[in-house]
Structures are given as structure tokens and as C-alpha cells.
Amino acid sequence: MGQSVSATRRVSRLRRHARLRKKIAGTPERPRLVVNRSARHIHVQLVNDENGTTVAAASSIEDDVRSLQGDKKARSVRVGQLIAERAKAAGIDSVVFDRGGYTYGGRIAALADAARENGLQF
């Protein structure tokens, strides 16, 4: 018997992410923008891989995002704006985008575009 469709999709996503992680790493000057998506929420972190620390983070679980009216895509846009603001406050203008193996579309693209519009360089 084969795997379920959801298990196959998850394994494929993890393989894509592993391939991507071989090629990119975050530095103090240019941290990695990591996106994690669930069915309900989206989380994003700026990670310095040299010392394994999180520089800044934003999530749709936060109160000001959670209270937003609209769909999950609108919340992703707000999370992208928040991470760009927090990156600027930490003195970061450029990042390496790690989409976590997710396809670039929908909520992932909305978050990335909002971060770019608010001054974050990819």
C-alpha cells in the first residue's frame, strides 16, 4: 500500500526544503527569512544560522493580526509587514528567503510581496 496524499505532499515539501537548505544559510548581515505555514496560521522568523539565533519573528497568532478582518491571505500580508518593520528595527535590510519547501504562491507570495513593499530586500 502507498502513502496517503497528505503524507506524500508532506514528504515532498520536506525534500524540497532539504534541497534548498543545502544552498542557503543566514548570516548576521543577511539572515534567513524562514516561513512556516499551517492550515490556519503562518509564522515567519529571521534566523542567523552562524550562531543559531532568531533575530526577529512575526506570526498570525499575534493579537493585532488575529483581530484583522479578512481571509488568511490578508493576515499573511500583515505578517509580512510586521517582519519588515521588525527587521528594520534590528538594522537588517536584506534577507535570504527560505520558503520552507512550500510553493511560491498564495499566502507565501503575499507575505513575501508585503515584506518587499515595506523595504526588505530579498
UniProtKB/Swiss-Prot annotation:
- Name the domain of life: Bacteria
A GO MF label: 5S rRNA binding
BP GO terms, sorted: translation
Record's keyword terms, sorted: Ribonucleoprotein, Ribosomal protein, RNA-binding, rRNA-binding
Q: Name one Pfam family in it.
A: Ribosomal_L18p
**InterPro entries attached to this UniProt entry:** Ribosomal_uL18_bac-type, Ribosomal_uL18_bac/euk
Quote a single Gene Ontology cellular component term. cytosolic large ribosomal subunit
Similarity remark: Belongs to the universal ribosomal protein uL18 family.
PANTHER family in the record = 39S RIBOSOMAL PROTEIN L18, MITOCHONDRIAL (PTHR12899), LARGE RIBOSOMAL SUBUNIT PROTEIN UL18M (PTHR12899:SF3)
Q: What does this protein do?
A: This is one of the proteins that bind and probably mediate the attachment of the 5S RNA into the large ribosomal subunit, where it forms part of the central protuberance.
Q: How does it assemble?
A: Part of the 50S ribosomal subunit; part of the 5S rRNA/L5/L18/L25 subcomplex. Contacts the 5S and 23S rRNAs.
Name of protein: Large ribosomal subunit protein uL18
Source organism (scientific name): Mycobacterium avium (strain 104)
Q: Give the gene symbol.
A: rplR
